[in-house]
C-alpha cells in the first residue's frame, strides 16, 4: 500500500466550509471541456435518458492518468452508451493499443456501437456484448492491459476486480468509479436505507480488502474513486 484512505477536511474548525467544497467540485467540473460535438451529444443524450455516466471531474482525472502512464491496451467493464469509452479508446489508439469494452445491456451496447462508428473508433477497438463475468475469462490471456476501468454492477465489483487484476501489466492501474455509492458507504449503518444495506456492505468489504491487500488509494471526489497500482 502506498497511500491509505484520505482524511476528510476538518469542517468543524472552519478550514474548509462544506459549501466551498461543493463550489470547488463545480469549478473542477467546469474545467473539463468537451471539444467534440459528437461526444457532447453522447453525454447530453445519456443524461437525458438517465444513463449513468462518469462525472466530468472524474473523467478528467481518469484520462489525465491514462495519458500519463501512456496506456496502450485498455479494458473497460461497463460500456453503457460509450461516453467514457470514446475518451479511453482515443488514448489507447494514440499509444498504439486498443480499447476492449464490455456491456451487458443490449440497447446500450447498440447505442455505444453507433457512437463509436460516428467517431471512426469502432474498427480500431473491440466492443463486446455480454456479461463481464463470462466475457473476461474468454479474453486472450496473452494480452495484458495497462489501464482497466471498472464502473459496472457494484455488487460484482470484487469479482470484476479479481478477474481483471490478473490481466493487468506490472505498474498498470485499475480505476474504479462510484465506490462511495451516493455517499452511503461513509454514513452510519442506521442511516442507510434498507434497500441499499447489502450493496453498501459489499462495497465496504471491497474497499477494506483493497486497502489491506493492494497498492490502493480512495479519493473522495465524484462518488468515490478507487485506484489500484500493480
Features from the language model and the residues they span:
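A short alpha-helical cap/connector motif
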Residues: 1-147, 154-175, 179-230
Amino acid at each position: 500500500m502506498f497511500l491509505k484512505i484520505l482524511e476528510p477536511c476538518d469542517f468543524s474548525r472552519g478550514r474548509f466550509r462544506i459549501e466551498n467544497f461543493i463550489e470547488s467540485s463545480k469549478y473542477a467540473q467546469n474545467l473539463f471541456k468537451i471539444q467534440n460535438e459528437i461526444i457532447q451529444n453522447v453525454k447530453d443524450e445519456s443524461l437525458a435518458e438517465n444513463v449513468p455516466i462518469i462525472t466530468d471531474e472524474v473523467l478528467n482525472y481518469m484520462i489525465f492518468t491514462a495519458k500519463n502512464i501512456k496506456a496502450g491496451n485498455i479494458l473497460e467493464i461497463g460500456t453503457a452508451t460509450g461516453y467514457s469509452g470514446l475518451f479511453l479508446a482515443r488514448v489507447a489508439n494514440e499509444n498504439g493499443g486498443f480499447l476492449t469494452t464490455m456491456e451487458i445491456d443490449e440497447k446500450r451496447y447498440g447505442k455505444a456501437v453507433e457512437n463509436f462508428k460516428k467517431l471512426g473508433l469502432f474498427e480500431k477497438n473491440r466492443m463486446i456484448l455480454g456479461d463481464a463475468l463470462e466475457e473476461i475469462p474468454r479474453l486472450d490471456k496473452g494480452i495484458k492491459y495497462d489501464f482497466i476501468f471498472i464502473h459496472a454492477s457494484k455488487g460484482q465489483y470484487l469479482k470484476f476486480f479479481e478477474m481483471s487484476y490478473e490481466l493487468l501489466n506490472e505498474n498498470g492501474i485499475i480505476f474504479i468509479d462510484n465506490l462511495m455509492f451516493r455517499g452511503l458507504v461513509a454514513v452510519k449503518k442506521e442511516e442507510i436505507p434498507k434497500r441499499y444495506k447489502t450493496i453498501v456492505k459489499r462495497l465496504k468489504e471491497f474497499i477494506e480488502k483493497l486497502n489491506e491487500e493492494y497498492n490502493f488509494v480512495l479519493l473522495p471526489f465524484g462518488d468515490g474513486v478507487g485506484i489500484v497500482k500493480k
